[in-house]
From Swiss-Prot:
A GO molecular function held by the record: toxin activity
Source organism: Conus mustelinus (Weasel cone)
Disulphide connectivity of cysteines: C63-C72, C68-C80, C73-C90, C78-C92
A GO cellular component annotation in the UniProt record: host cell postsynaptic membrane
Protein family (similarity comment): Belongs to the conotoxin D superfamily.
Protein name: Alpha-conotoxin Ms20.3
Length: 94
């Protein structure tokens, strides 16, 4: 398969299911301001924190654990700390 075809295939498949290793999930609410909040209150969803990508956007990222900057912490019980020159990161006990 030519390189261009492989790249295009990856670009088509990648956005379909965007989950990171720490339990982050991209969700789409509705166009109203509290769409993500209403989405999370339905069913058995147990998401701790959400962040809308851009103001007025209906897309956002939600974490099953604590959100630190733009990433999800690896497990619950972590705190978000600032590391000089490296930015925000998760500090987890034990």
């Amino acid at each position: 398969m030519p390189k261009l075809a492989v790249v295009l295939l990856v670009l088509l498949i990648l956005p379909l299911s965007y989950f990171d290793a720490a339990g982050g999930q991209v969700v789409q609410g509705d166009r109203r301001g509290n769409g993500l909040a209403r989405y999370l209150q339905r069913g058995d969803r147990d998401v701790r924190e959400c962040q809308v990508n851009t103001p007025g956007s209906s897309w956002g990222k939600c974490c099953m654990t604590r959100m630190c900057g733009t990433m999800c912490c690896a497990r619950s019980g972590c705190t978000c700390v600032y590391h000089w020159r490296r930015g925000h990161g998760c500090s987890c006990p034990g």
